[in-house]
């Protein structure tokens, strides 16, 4: 859709979970490895920010990278 407006559209992707300190995440070593509330769920450890994809005009690559991302957890209620 954006390519219909401009020929120079680019998109990048970065991801953040939360601050990696109390009171935002549980700092117990086991919970840092897998912060999901249910033990049978597998979540990635919390992180402040990850650069995932440089600016690109490739919409398929953007979709693929977003689709590969796992969930994490925090202490929000």
Swiss-Prot record:
Belongs to the integrin beta chain family. Keywords: Cell adhesion, Disulfide bond, Glycoprotein, Integrin, Membrane, Receptor, Transmembrane. It comes from the Eukaryota. It is a single-pass type I membrane protein. Disulfide bonds join 36-43. Coiled coil: none annotated. Its main location: membrane. This is Integrin beta-2. Glycans are attached at residue 54. One of its GO terms (molecular function) is amyloid-beta binding. It is found in: Membrane. Dimer of an alpha and beta subunit. Integrins are a large family of cell surface glycoproteins that mediate cell to cell and cell to matrix adhesion. One of its GO terms (biological process) is cell adhesion mediated by integrin. GO terms for cellular component: cell surface; focal adhesion; integrin complex. It comes from Xenopus laevis (African clawed frog). The keyword Glycoprotein applies.
């Amino acid at each position: 859709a954006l390519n219909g407006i401009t020929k120079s559209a680019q998109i990048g992707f970065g991801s953040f979970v939360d601050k990696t300190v109390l009171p935002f995440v549980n700092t117990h070593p086991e919970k840092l490895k897998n912060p999901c509330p249910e033990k049978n769920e597998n979540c990635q450890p919390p992180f402040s920010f990850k650069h995932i994809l440089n600016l690109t005009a490739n919409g398929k690559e953007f979709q693929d990278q977003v689709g590969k991302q796992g969930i994490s957890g925090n202490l929000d209620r």
